[in-house]
């Protein structure tokens, strides 16, 4: 079928992206779903820092690639053996879980090796690609395969994905809420619940108040924890206070005031943010790093403090989540009025506005910009 989507043509394009235009919006061909796959009509897709990290070259992926990994939509067709019904609303998650590998047996601590390999290759978890487009190399007509982004490729009117990349939700969950569950909430909330595991009454600090960090803050507040929000952007600190943070300050002030917590989540994806998060971690506490810095980034911490203060440092990919287990938990918090996810939405945009939206995200001024279809 013919669809419209946003394709990344090159990595490491110069900013501003509104001028360099590394992403083009145009027609593509989408093959029907194969065994264990579903065709999803995309309703809403979120623009995340993981999208930006591919565009700016921090996370190199094969191109051309149809971007987008955080989304919600409705199943319109199914391949052989698929269990989902047509008409079912689903949350799309960016790490398929085969359920069979040794990594899947770690209950979310490690990402699925099968899904990770497919994501790195730009294929679906079952192998192969379902996307292509007309191509004119040197003036001769042809067809070019287009890679999938993290098994989803949600910046399009439709997507074919493995059933292992989606989680069904009830129709009362609006698509804008459902989309946020697939990455921001799974990652940020999971960093708190699955990796940090604060005890009742423990204070939680979050360093980096983008979409993932603010989601971590929301989940921690929903679970009754006193929360410290840390960010360099004053508007984000103000929003953190509005969303229930007991304290919201800049990084240097947090260190100067010795605002320590038993659980500290680093969600900025930078070495300096990691150092700040470690400095704010109380003796015996846990530093959870969920951000994705450049592969060459290096941080400096004191090994003596790690030993003498019995500290723990935990890496948490996708919030150490098992999506089929965790998404229903967040839905229940939302239904109870304890998880105001609409507060994460900073802008609603169209596909054609993606280059400008990428610039806003890179500047640090945006939380979650949602592409509405």
Model regions and ranges:
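Glycine-rich beta-strand-centered segment in the early N-terminal region that forms part
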Residues: 31-45, 56-105, 110, 118, ...
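Residues at the starts of beta-strands that form the adenosine-phosphate
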Residues: 4, 203, 226, 286, ...
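Glycine-rich phosphate-binding loop and adjacent beta-alpha segment
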Residues: 271-338, 373
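C-terminal hydrophobic helical "lid"/dimerization subdomain
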Residues: 1, 324-373
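Cysteine-cluster motifs in flexible loop/terminal segments that predominantly coordinate metals
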Residues: 94-158, 162-163
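Short N-terminal strand-loop motif that marks the start
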Residues: 1-72, 153, 157-161
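Mid-domain Rossmann-like dinucleotide-binding core that forms the NAD(H)/NADP(H) cofactor-binding site
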Residues: 86-89, 150, 157-158, 164-251
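A short acidic, Gly/Pro-enriched loop at the edge of an enzyme's catalytic core
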Residues: 255-264
């Amino acid at each position: 079928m013919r669809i419209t989507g946003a394709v990344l043509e090159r990595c490491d394009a110069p900013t501003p992206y509104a001028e360099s235009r590394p992403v083009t919006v145009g027609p593509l061909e989408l093959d029907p779903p194969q065994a264990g796959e579903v065709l999803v009509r995309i309703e809403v897709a979120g623009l995340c820092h993981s999208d930006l990290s591919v565009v700016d070259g921090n996370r190199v992926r094969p191109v051309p690639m149809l971007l987008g990994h955080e989304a919600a939509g409705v199943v319109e067709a199914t391949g052989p053996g698929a269990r989902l019904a047509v008409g079912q609303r689903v949350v799309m998650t960016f790490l398929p879980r085969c359920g069979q590998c040794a990594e899947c047996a770690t209950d979310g601590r490690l990402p699925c090796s099968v899904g990770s390999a497919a994501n790195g290759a730009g294929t679906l978890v079952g192998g192969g690609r379902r996307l292509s487009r007309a191509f004119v190399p040197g003036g001769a007509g042809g067809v070019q395969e287009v890679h999938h982004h993290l098994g989803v490729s949600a910046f399009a009117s439709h997507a074919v994905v493995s059933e292992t990349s989606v989680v069904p939700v009830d129709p009362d969950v609006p698509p804008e809420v459902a989309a946020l569950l697939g990455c921001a909430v799974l990652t940020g909330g999971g960093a708190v619940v699955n990796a940090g595991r604060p005890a009742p009454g423990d204070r939680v600090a979050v360093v980096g108040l983008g979409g993932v960090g603010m989601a971590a803050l929301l989940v921690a507040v929903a679970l009754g924890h006193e929360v410290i929000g840390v960010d360099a952007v004053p508007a984000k600190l103000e929003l953190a206070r509005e969303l229930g943070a007991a304290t919201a300050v800049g990084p240097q002030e947090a260190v100067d005031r010795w605002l320590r917590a038993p659980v500290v989540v680093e969600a900025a994806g930078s070495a300096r943010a990691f150092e700040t998060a470690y400095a704010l971690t109380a003796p015996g506490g846990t530093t959870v790093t969920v951000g994705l810095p450049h592969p060459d980034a290096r941080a400096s911490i004191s090994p003596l403090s790690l030993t003498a203060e019995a500290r723990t440092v935990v890496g948490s990919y996708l919030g150490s989540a098992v999506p089929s287990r965790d998404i229903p938990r967040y839905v229940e918090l939302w239904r109870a009025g304890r998880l105001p996810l609409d507060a994460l939405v900073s802008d609603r945009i169209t596909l054609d506005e993606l280059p400008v939206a990428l610039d806003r995200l890179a500047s640090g001024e945006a939380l979650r910009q949602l592409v509405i279809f």
